[in-house]
UniProtKB/Swiss-Prot annotation:
It comes from Bacteroides thetaiotaomicron (strain ATCC 29148 / DSM 2079 / JCM 5827 / CCUG 10774 / NCTC 10582 / VPI-5482 / E50). GO terms for cellular component: cytosolic small ribosomal subunit. This is Small ribosomal subunit protein uS17B. One of the primary rRNA binding proteins, it binds specifically to the 5'-end of 16S ribosomal RNA. It holds the Pfam family Ribosomal_S17. Keywords: Ribonucleoprotein, Ribosomal protein, RNA-binding, rRNA-binding. Belongs to the universal ribosomal protein uS17 family. InterPro entries: NA-bd_OB-fold (IPR012340), Ribosomal_uS17 (IPR000266), Ribosomal_uS17_bact/chlr (IPR019984). It comes from the Bacteria. One of its GO terms (molecular function) is rRNA binding.
Length: 98
């Protein structure tokens, strides 16, 4: 195995293809719009309990970037994963779902 410092720089080679990481897409309901250009959405997921086998609902809240502030509380929205806007905000508003 070649040590790291002796490996050729592959990213400068024209033959190397750049791989894109598939981005996550989430759907949820807007819970809060009290921050500037940020909304909080709640995403529900159903999962089987590992031991008992019962289907359990889990909820998680995400902060998403809404630059035009077009969301309001109760809207069902779609958001895409993107670069970090802050420590906890790494989703961008895509569109409303009706």
């Amino acid at each position: 195995m070649v040590p790291c410092r002796l490996r050729p720089f592959l990213w400068n080679s024209p033959k190397v293809a750049v791989k894109r990481i598939p981005r996550q897409c989430i759907e949820g309901i807007v819970v809060s719009t009290k921050m500037q250009k940020t909304v909080v959405i709640e995403v529900e997921r159903t999962k089987k309990h590992p031991k008992y086998g019962k289907t359990v609902q889990y909820t998680k809240k995400y902060k998403i970037h809404d630059p035009l502030e077009e969301c309001s509380v109760g809207d069902r929205v779609l958001a895409h994963e993107t670069r970090h806007f802050s420590k906890t905000k790494y989703f961008r508003f895509y569109r409303k779902l009706y």
